[in-house]
């Protein structure tokens, strides 16, 4: 392929990925299926279930048209290939065109099947039917969900492609092509995983995401996972009726201070250590009096007479956790992105130090 074709291919790949996974920039610009078809989809607040039935169907159709869009674009980007004359095109392009034509046809047939019987064939309608009473239908369940979603006390979090919504009766996970639904009175919740990232793209602070398994006692309801920021864990628990089991004993950091302590600990453990003689006994930490002091401040960040940090001559008097809490307490709470690079005074002698100067006693 020549330069225009290569440029178009790269640009179209980036556009397709962003159109499918919709980053914040695309949402702000309104380049989403929800925004482009807002007139047909209706309002999520008015009819949550019917909105997502239509949204998931429209999203599948829109995404299936992306290969055809690429082929049409290539007809203009590489006119010398004469792709518009399929019979003269290379075999690889013939296969691609066939796929680009069959894919939207197949999804159109599937969407048409879903729309029959007033959308009763849609996967979301069938999911709701599992929760319906014997003499009722999925529409009664949809009405209940629509009513509860309109209330302002619901719990809602997550990106548009993976939202978690909890109402008084229902736990729901909204993804690009489907909506998982479970009834609160029927579920067991278990924390299964935890991932910590050093920096959040939104706030430049450490962030922890936890994964919770939602399993229903109803055998027809498939289990699903929800993922949320650990700082929202407490709010989620308040909205749930069932307890959340932590079978893996995962430490959940519900505050910024908790996450900072974990990062502080990992950084200090990678620092220089401070050796003491075998006959020297460590005193209890004067901060908590629960464990022995195991931290000594030694200036390692720069040479002795350089920088703002100073040499501390105090004996070990603090444990790692208490020193981390002291370090966090002296920071600007409005700018957590500066915490790791700042200096604070020693809690005893007031000599300034940074994280690099914190040494574990061995």
UniProtKB/Swiss-Prot annotation:
Enzyme Commission numbers on file: 2.3.2.27
Signal peptide range in chain numbering: none
Domain text: The RING-type zinc finger domain is responsible for E3 ubiquitin ligase activity.
Record-linked Pfam families: Tmpp129 (PF10272)
Subunit structure as annotated in this protein's UniProt entry: Integral component of ER-resident dislocation complexes.
Protein name: E3 ubiquitin-protein ligase TM129
Function text: E3 ubiquitin-protein ligase involved in ER-associated protein degradation, preferentially associates with the E2 enzyme UBE2J2.
ZnF RING-type span: 285-350
Biological process per Gene Ontology, one example term: response to unfolded protein
Family, similarity comment: Belongs to the TMEM129 family.
Pathway in which the depicted protein is active: Protein modification; protein ubiquitination
Residue stretches in coiled coil: none
Keywords noted in UniProt: Endoplasmic reticulum, Membrane, Metal-binding, Transferase, Transmembrane, Transmembrane helix, Ubl conjugation pathway, Unfolded protein response, Zinc, Zinc-finger
A molecular function GO annotation: zinc ion binding
InterPro entries: TM129 (IPR018801)
An example Gene Ontology CC term for this record: endoplasmic reticulum
Top-level enzyme category: transferase
Entry annotated with the keyword Secreted: no
Parts of the chain on the Cytoplasmic side: 28-56, 116-362
Reactions performed catalytically: S-ubiquitinyl-[E2 ubiquitin-conjugating enzyme]-L-cysteine + [acceptor protein]-L-lysine = [E2 ubiquitin-conjugating enzyme]-L-cysteine + N(6)-ubiquitinyl-[acceptor protein]-L-lysine
Intervals, Lumenal compartment: 1-6, 78-94
Keyword Transport: no
Membrane topology: Multi-pass membrane protein
Compartment(s): Endoplasmic reticulum membrane
Transmembrane spans: 7-27, 57-77, 95-115
């Amino acid at each position: 392929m020549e330069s225009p074709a290569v440029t178009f291919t790269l640009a179209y790949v980036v556009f397709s990925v962003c159109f499918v996974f919709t980053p914040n920039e695309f949402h702000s610009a309104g380049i989403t299926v929800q925004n482009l078809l807002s007139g047909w989809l209706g309002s999520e607040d008015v009819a949550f279930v019917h909105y997502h039935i239509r949204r998931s169907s429209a999203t599948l159709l829109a995404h299936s048209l992306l290969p055809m869009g690429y082929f049409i674009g290539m007809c203009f980007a590489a006119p010398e290939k004469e792709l518009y004359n399929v019979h003269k095109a290379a075999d690889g392009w013939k296969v691609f065109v066939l796929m680009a034509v069959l894919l939207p046809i197949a999804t159109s047939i599937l969407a048409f099947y879903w729309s029959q019987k007033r959308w009763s064939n849609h996967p979301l309608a069938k999911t709701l039917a599992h929760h319906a009473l014997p003499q009722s239908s999925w529409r009664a369940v949809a009405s209940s969900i629509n009513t509860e979603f309109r209330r302002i006390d619901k719990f809602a979090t997550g990106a548009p492609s993976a939202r978690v919504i909890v109402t008084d009766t229902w736990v729901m996970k909204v993804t690009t092509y489907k909506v998982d639904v479970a009834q609160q009175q029927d579920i067991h919740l278990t924390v299964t995983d935890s991932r910590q990232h050093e920096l959040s793209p939104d706030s430049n602070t450490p962030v922890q995401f936890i994964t919770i398994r939602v399993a229903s006692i109803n055998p027809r309801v498939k289990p699903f996972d929800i993922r949320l920021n650990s700082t929202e864990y407490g709010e989620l628990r308040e909205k749930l009726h069932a307890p959340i089991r932590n079978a893996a004993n995962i430490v959940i950091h519900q505050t910024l201070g908790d996450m900072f302590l974990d990062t502080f600990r990992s950084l200090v453990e990678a620092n220089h250590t401070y050796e003491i003689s075998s006959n020297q006994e460590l005193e209890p930490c004067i901060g908590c009096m629960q464990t022995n002091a195991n931290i000594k401040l030694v200036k390692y960040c720069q040479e002795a007479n350089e920088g703002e940090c100073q040499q501390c001559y105090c004996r070990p008097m603090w444990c790692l956790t208490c020193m981390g809490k002291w370090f966090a307490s002296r920071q600007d709470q409005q700018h957590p992105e500066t915490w790791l690079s700042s200096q604070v005074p020693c809690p005893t002698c007031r000599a300034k130090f940074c994280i690099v100067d914190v040494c574990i006693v061995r």
